[in-house]
Amino acid sequence: MKFSLTLILSCLIIFISSCSMSQRRDFVEPDINLKIKTTNKNKEIIIQSLLKDGDIFSISFGDEDSYVLANNILNSDLKYFCKSLVEEEREVLEKNIFKSKKDVNKKVIVVFSENYENIASFLKNKYPEEEYFMIMPEDFDTQIKEILNVDLSIENYNDLSKFDTSLKISHSPRIRDDIGSIYYITDYDVGKTIVPIFRSYALNMDTFSSSEIFHDANDIKKLVDFENTYIPITKKMIENISKKQDPLIKSEIENSLIRDFLIIEKVFQNNLFRENLLPISGNIKIKRSGCIDRNLNLWKVSTADFTD
C-alpha cells in the first residue's frame, strides 16, 4: 500500500501536536534521528520505510546542517559507502572481464550504446587491445553479424553450395574464434534486443553487464532476455526485486539503497554492530570504522526461480 507524502506528513504533524498538547512525560527515545535534505520522492520512500519497520523516529528535512541525499541514488556516494552502487558494479566487472581474463589470447568484445560512449572510451584507453563497438539503434542483426563475422561463415556456406545444388549441407553459422567474452554497456531498450541476438549466435559465450541493462524493465520475468549473463548484484537485492511493488526494477533498487542507508544509520546511532547486519546491496557486514565496500559477487541471470 502506498501513501502520499502530504498525507503522511499531515498525520505526523497531527500526532506530534497531540503529544505536545497532552504534555506526555513518558517520552520514548527514538530508534533513529534523521536530518536530511532530499527530494520529495526520497522523502516519501524514507517515511514509508520507517513506518513499515515500526521504528520510533525523529526526522527533519529542513535543517542547514542536514545530510544531502542526492536524487540520483544509483550514481551517488551514499553515506557510509565507499562508492556508488553503479561505480562498484563497473569495478567488479572490470576486474572479472579484463584483469582476470580466462584466456589472454582471446579478445573481450565491448558492445555499447551511444549514451555510454564515455565509459567505453575510458575502458579503451586502459585496455586498447580489446575490441569496442558502438551499436546503433537500427538493424541490430546486421551489426551483430558483422561484429561476430557471421556473414563470412554464411558466405562460405553459400559458395560451397554452388558447387552442387543437389547436395544438402547442414550449416550453423560460426562466429569468429578469437572472442573470449562479451561486455554489454547499454540501457534496457537496447539490451533487451541485442542480447538475445548475440546469444543466438554465441550461445556458450560468457557475457557480462551491470544491472543498468535491466533497470527500466517492469517485471523480473523480463530478465529472460538476459539469461546466463553475469551481473554484479546481491541475492537479497534480486529477492527484493522479485517481490517489488514499484513499476520499474530501478525504483526497487533505489528503495533498497535508501533502506540500506536507514539500516546503517540505525546501527550507528544505537551501537548495533554486534548484530552483524548486512546491507541489502552488499555482502560485507556493517562495520564501525571506514567506509563500506559492497564486495559484490557476479550473479548469473536465471529466471527459473521467478517463473510461475
PLM feature spans:
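Extracytosolic ligand-binding ectodomains
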Residues: 2-10, 18-308
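Conserved P-loop NTPase catalytic core
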Residues: 13
